[in-house]
Amino acid sequence: MKSLQALFGGTFDPVHYGHLKPVETLANLIGLSRVIIMPNNVPPHRPQPEASSAQRKYMLELAIDDKPLFTLDERELQRNAPSYTAQTLKAWREEQGPEAPLAFIIGQDSLLNFPTWHDYDTILDNTHLIVCRRPGYPLEMTQAQHQQWLEQHLTHTPDDLHQLPAGKIYLAETPWLNISATLIRERLEKGESCDDLLPENVLNYINQQGLYR
């Protein structure tokens, strides 16, 4: 049996401990062998990132340099069109074959607006969803049909993620760090310290490049 691997997408503008630490804890909790970080080039749901694709890629390389759990996948950075998760996960499934257990990691805030994503209802055909719980967010979807969809696919057993190739949603109890890329950009713009919010080598690069000023 192939080991469970997961994809973790985002703009990472910049990457910070709020991205990395919960996923490292998650990997230990459920036995993830590999987490593939996939930065977006043109995110459909957000404004264009402030840092360039090359700068965000380099910051990620710095952040995961000493973390063998993580690898970097650049395919979405090489697209000039919006990156739709459903398309990316379909391509990943085709590469990995029908039996490999695959998962996509999202935050609880993303789960609540998941039905607005492009072709959201095809995503579980190709992967599991692992949701990092966040305090203060409700556990129910806003519409009954979407709540029914959640309950239909929900599992409380991490073993299901290893034994099945796709189709399950698992709510993981991961630590919540009150850190966001927006907060970091705002603090940098004001000249405030971000020493405890992101890796030192990433912060040094940001300062060298004069980013987010």
Curated annotation (Swiss-Prot):
Q: Specify the superkingdom.
A: Bacteria
Q: Which gene encodes it?
A: nadD
Q: Which UniProt keywords apply?
A: ATP-binding, NAD, Nucleotide-binding, Nucleotidyltransferase, Pyridine nucleotide biosynthesis, Transferase
Pfam families of this UniProt entry? CTP_transf_like (PF01467)
Quick check: keyword Cytoplasm in the entry? no
* Reaction equation(s) it catalyzes: nicotinate beta-D-ribonucleotide + ATP + H(+) = deamido-NAD(+) + diphosphate
Q: In which pathway does it act?
A: Cofactor biosynthesis; NAD(+) biosynthesis; deamido-NAD(+) from nicotinate D-ribonucleotide: step 1/1
Biological function: Catalyzes the reversible adenylation of nicotinate mononucleotide (NaMN) to nicotinic acid adenine dinucleotide (NaAD).
**GO MF entries:** ATP binding; nicotinate-nucleotide adenylyltransferase activity
Q: Supply the InterPro entries for this chain.
A: Cyt_trans-like, NadD/NMNAT, Rossmann-like_a/b/a_fold
Q: Which organism is it from?
A: Salmonella enteritidis PT4 (strain P125109)
Family to which this protein belongs:
Belongs to the NadD family.
Q: What class of enzyme is it?
A: transferase
Annotated GO biological processes are:
NAD biosynthetic process
Q: What is this protein called?
A: Probable nicotinate-nucleotide adenylyltransferase
Entry EC no(s): 2.7.7.18
